Amino acid sequence: MNLVMVLAVYATISKALGMPLRHPGTQENYHALYQCTDTALLSRALVWMATDSRCANEPFNITNGDLIRWENLWPKMASYFGMEVGPRQHIKLTEMMADKASLWDRIVSQHELRRIPYDKIASWGYGDFVFGAGFDIISSMTKARRYGFHEVRDTEEMFFRMFDDLRASKMIP
């Protein structure tokens, strides 16, 4: 599942509709602690697990190692996409985004983006899952640290780096 694509496409479509960037989750979700995992970090952790004999048959949690709250990150995301922050509004992305394929096709043509079918570009159900959680989502990295994996990533930097990568690869305008 790719939360970065959900956020990027949601912001792009909201902007095209002239809407502010509204947090689509519950009020509790907006204030809860949340963790993410950078795919490059996960790849490095998988190599570590596969090559360190102490890791054989051991389960590990792998996250960036920091915590975010959407309430702190949301204004920065809005700024990144050149948008105002809208009021938080619990939105079912699966419903709101269901009829936006033709709009997405126009955005793709207008900005000469890569043509990826709309139903493949973002997992709105995953977005509903992430933004529907009304509680902290925290996984302990203690075991991985005890076994020797100490790498971390800054989640805010991760999001903006990935958004930059999506722009550079013509996935979003």
Where are the language model's segments positioned?
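C-terminal/domain-terminus segments
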Residues: 6, 145-173
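Mid/C-terminal beta-alpha module of Rossmann-like enzyme folds, strongest
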Residues: 36, 42-127, 140-142, 146, ...
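A broad, low-specificity signal marking well-ordered, structured residues that form hydrophobic/aromatic
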Residues: 21, 60, 149
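A conserved mid-domain beta-alpha-beta active-site/ligand-binding segment of alpha/beta enzyme cores
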Residues: 130-131
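NAD(P)-dependent short-chain dehydrogenase/reductase
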Residues: 1-44, 77
